[in-house]
Amino acid sequence: MIRFATPADLPWLQAHDHHVAPVELATLVSLGRVLIAQEGDEPVGWLRWNLFWDNTPFMNMLYILEPWQRRGIGRQLVNRWESQAREAGFAAVMTSTQANEEAQHFYRKLGYRDAGVLLLPGEAAEIIFHKELTAHA
């Protein structure tokens, strides 16, 4: 099941998502910008997003806990997020990943196209992906 995160999910999210400050995570939850994948009563993954240039949904984090990977849960989260963005009137979405071939293949398989590369000193290349949303997808 895919659902919006609630304030009750914050302790679980904070224990697993170390890439965002707790206060920012709480704000994103309150804005409906965090989705939870759940199996039974157990959260097994999440998708967190914000806006790029204040006008394009950008997926900042997609993570599925190890025992639940390769079961289509990531695809379900992304599909739900894209549907939500489409319903809100957005024409496109974006995301990025470090130069990890498996993650690149995942996004390309979902229809994302390479849009650029971010190079930071001492960091792996970050590949930016873009996807046009259609009314029927």
Give residue ranges: language-model regions:
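Short acidic/glycine-enriched loop/turn segments that link adjacent beta-strands
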Residues: 31, 55, 101, 121-125
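Helix-turn-helix
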Residues: 103, 110
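Conserved acetyl-CoA-binding loop-helix of GNAT-fold acetyltransferases
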Residues: 70-83, 108-109
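Conserved GNAT acetyl-CoA-binding A-motif
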Residues: 85-98
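Conserved catalytic-core motifs of GNAT/GCN5-like acyltransferases
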Residues: 94-96, 113-128
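Acetyl-CoA-dependent GNAT
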Residues: 4-60, 65, 78-79, 84, ...
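A short, internal acetyl-CoA/4′-phosphopantetheine-binding micro-motif in the GNAT/acyltransferase core
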Residues: 62-69, 98
